[in-house]
From Swiss-Prot:
Adapter protein involved in neuronal nitric-oxide (NO) synthesis regulation via its association with nNOS/NOS1. The complex formed with NOS1 and synapsins is necessary for specific NO and synapsin functions at a presynaptic level. Mediates an indirect interaction between NOS1 and RASD1 leading to enhance the ability of NOS1 to activate RASD1. Competes with DLG4 for interaction with NOS1, possibly affecting NOS1 activity by regulating the interaction between NOS1 and DLG4. In kidney podocytes, plays a role in podosomes and filopodia formation through CDC42 activation. Interacts with the PDZ domain of NOS1 or the second PDZ domain of DLG4 through its C-terminus. Interacts with RASD1 and SYN1, SYN2 and SYN3 via its PID domain. Forms a ternary complex with NOS1 and RASD1. Forms a ternary complex with NOS1 and SYN1. This is Carboxyl-terminal PDZ ligand of neuronal nitric oxide synthase protein. GO terms for cellular component: anchoring junction; caveola; cytoplasm; cytosol; filopodium; glutamatergic synapse; mitochondrion; nucleus. Residues 491-503 are annotated as: Interaction with NOS1. It is found in: Cell projection, Filopodium; Cell projection, Podosome. Changing I501 to S/A: Does not affect interaction with NOS1. The modification Phosphoserine is found at S183, S187, S190, S262, S368, S371, S398, S414. Residues 170-212, 266-285 are annotated as: Disordered. Keywords: Cell junction, Cell projection, Coiled coil, Phosphoprotein.
Length: 503
């Protein structure tokens, strides 16, 4: 074999248009050696990304569990893919029980997808569907070389193509036998009675009883069965990756209407004639009806689960609303209690105000004077509201307070004798306990009491307004004339609100 140069770098083994093996070799089976990583059940993948993710997840899980890889022998034939555990024979063991060494066996038409990892080209896997439970199972393997993994993937793809051709031949034979007559059609329906069926023909007959999950259903005349189409099985038929590796095998003849890596090719093409016995009551139509009923049942179960979930959600919302309503009622009750306490407090205050008003209105004239005098004594003297000619107060400790009160002469211009003056002064003198004690023993005389016209309801405002005016009064100079502290004439105070009351 000539060596490769830079002008002869083409390797036929990597050319997808050239088949790897002879079609007759698939009748006997083609064997490969690899290491079995593990298998796990996966949901039906919808994209290549999901398949690669499942492949890597299986690798990492088995590696984390410290499960060692097993050496196996992969046999690819028209009967399917068979994985046999590779184990050394003992010297005393003469019999070879293949059932004990068999790891798995999947027919070609049940294989869903075959590919290898883009990051590690030594890792490849295929997804097969279980016929009893319709569960997809991903089987991961590892080969010694990258080229070996590529050859295994392409061999499985070529096995699809060979089985598809054999199924077309078998369908054509059945169509030719149908033209001979009803008697010959019954005998030709299953082939020659004296000839034993080959592995490829057994695969093609199995498709009449069990179709692939992606098979396109043929509408039956006279039966109102819902038609539903499924997704494309070959994920690379939609969009292929531009990597250097090979995901699935491609048919060497592009003009042929087939998908090399898809199980759909096991069914007859649309251009070929329909197989006999496809009317009502055939196993294929019964299988389709059962499949439809199962899917309807699954749909009803899903709808029931959705309804139950909605009921649970409504119950949770109802419980939350009930809890919120109870909390709101508790808050309202607490507010009502607080309002009740406030109303009781307000009623108590109103009662006290009424009692004070009754006391103020029911007091005698002297009682009012005594109370007002007490207020005046505590707050200080109120300012005199008189004409501008009234002299300002002088120091209260002037010697004129004790000596010249009786002999004090009133000037002509003094406002004390006028009746139209705004303020009148009267003398209120607090006598000591013993009359014979002189005035000079330190007992102070009550200062001048200033009388102001006011109403009983305005006592508090007048009392509060005296604070600022008292400061102004204290700022006066002490050298001014002393204020008159005694009133010459004492008049009786009236009970009316407009009368003059001493403050």
């Amino acid at each position: 074999m000539p060596s490769k140069t830079k002008y002869n770098l083409v390797d036929d083994g990597h050319d997808l248009r050239i088949p790897l093996h002879n079609e007759d070799a698939f009748q006997h089976g083609i064997s490969f050696e690899a290491k079995y990583v593990g298998s796990l059940d996966v949901p039906r993948p919808n994209s290549r990304v999901e398949i690669v993710a499942a492949m890597r997840r299986i690798r990492y899980e088995f590696k984390a569990k410290n499960i060692k890889k097993k050496k196996v022998s992969i046999m690819v034939s028209v009967d399917g893919v068979k994985v046999i555990l590779k184990k050394k024979k003992k010297k005393k063991e003469w019999t070879w029980d293949e059932s004990k060494m068999l790891v798995m066996q999947d027919p070609i038409y049940r294989i869903f997808y075959v590919s290898h990892d883009s990051q590690d080209l030594k890792i490849f896997s295929y997804i097969a569907r279980d016929g009893a439970s319709n569960i997809f199972r991903c089987n991961v393997f590892k080969s010694k070389k990258k080229s070996q993994a590529m050859r295994i993937v392409r061999t499985v793809g070529q096995a699809f193509e060979v089985c598809h051709k054999l199924s077309l031949q078998h369908t054509q034979q059945n169509a030719d036998g149908q033209e001979d007559g009803e008697s010959e059609r019954n005998s030709d329906g299953s082939g020659d009675p004296g000839r034993q069926l080959t592995g490829a023909e057994r695969v093609s007959t199995a498709t009449a009883e069990e179709t692939d999950i992606d098979a396109v259903e043929v509408p039956l005349p006279g039966n109102d069965i819902l038609e539903f189409s499924r997704g494309v099985t070959d994920l690379d038929a939609i969009g292929k990756d531009g990597g250097s590796h090979i995901d699935t095998t491609v048919s060497p003849h592009p003009q042929e209407p087939m998908l090399a890596a898809s199980p759909r090719m096991l069914l007859p093409s649309s251009s070929s004639s329909k197989p006999p016995g496809l009317g009502t009551g055939t196993p294929l139509s019964t299988h389709h009806q059962m499949q439809l009923l199962q899917q309807l049942l699954q749909q009803q179960q899903q709808q029931t689960q959705v309804a139950v979930a909605q009921v649970h959600l409504l119950k949770d919302q109802l419980a939350a609303e009930a809890a919120a309503r109870l909390e709101a009622q508790a808050r309202v009750h607490q507010l009502l209690l607080q309002n009740k306490d406030m109303l009781q407090h307000i009623s108590l205050l109103v009662k006290q105000v009424q009692e004070l008003e009754l006391k103020l209105s029911g007091q005698s004239t002297m009682g009012s004077q005594d109370s007002l005098l007490e207020i005046t004594f505590r707050s200080g003297a109120l300012p005199v509201l008189c004409e501008s000619t009234t002299p300002k107060p002088e120091d209260l400790h002037s010697p004129l307070l004790g000596a010249g009160l009786a002999d004090f002469a009133h000037p002509v211009g003094s406002p004390l004798g006028r009746r139209d003056c705004l303020v009148k002064l009267e003398c209120f003198r607090f006598l000591p306990a013993e009359d014979n004690q002189p005035m000079a023993q330190g007992e102070p005389l009550l200062g001048g009491l200033e009388l102001i016209k006011f109403r009983e309801s305005g006592i508090a405002s007048e009392y509060e307004s005296n604070t600022d005016e008292s400061e102004e009064r204290d700022s006066w100079s002490q050298e001014e004339l002393p204020r008159l502290l005694n009133v010459l004439q004492r008049q009786e105070l009236g009970d009316s609100l407009d009368d003059e009351i001493a403050v």
